[in-house]
Amino acid sequence: MLFLPGRIFVSLFAMGAIAAASTQSPPDAVVAADGSGQYTSVQDAIVKAPQSASAEKPWIILVKPGIYKELIYAQREKRFVHLIGQDPKTTVITFNLGPKMLGLDGKPIGTFHTPTADIDADDFTAENITFENSAGKVGPALAIRVDGDRDIFRNCGFRGYQDTILINRGRQYFENCTITGATDFIFGGAVAFFEKCDIHCTGSGYVTAASTPVSEPFGYVFAHCTISGDSPGLKTYLGRPWRAFASVIYLNTTMSDVIRPVGWFNWDDPAREKTARYAEFNSTGPGANPAARVTWSKQLSAAEAAKITVETVLGGADNWNPIN
């Protein structure tokens, strides 16, 4: 079967229905495959978002519970789209593109053209929805790719195996999300804050593969999160540096014994031990083992950790604060 590479996505199937979601403003679009809404496809509702949407008047899309088998793309012009589901357990956007599938040119589409959800727009928000790539153990297969700035994900699920989430650039905030995968399943060069998220490892591998630019003081920060694993005997690393200056910090995170005592891996490149910026503060649980961690990672003091907040990590030149 041939698939279009790049960001020209076509919805194949959509199934589901919609219920009211928690928002003070009425929805601009309702997605329901049974015909009770305005659209039967999530992508169709995104396409209708006007360029006039703003922080004061976002384009709110309500998605009823259901399994939506489609690819979605929020292009750069589609700012201030709010995609609101009812429950991430019952509202799922899923597809199964793998890197070896062929495009129209007859060549494999590659990793970066596999995402089920491709978010290029700034100021995008998703709540109560799961994004899934169901391709399985086929190599890198993205559930979501994010290139937008000031994007927010609350109470969302992200399911994949390898490279589940590509946060490529910009700033993102993840709150109360569940993220599953095995290898490098949170990766990219963005600045991201993960608050109270559940990280679940389905295979032995690496939680993160950051490619933080040297100019960025922060890369990924995980605060008050939990890390667990599928089965006894499964072992994984907190991260490995995709690029030399990878930055990952875990604050007050509970780690099961899925985490290897050494914590971090140098990607078979000792030179990256001198440049990677890996740190923890107050890790707890069987996987928390400061004394056994690699010597090139850091254990932060309470004073150092106190300075790492949503505001200091994500604020930037525009003082963005996704909590407000």
Q: What is the predicted function of each stretch?
A:
Residues 1-22:
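Fungal secretory targeting signals
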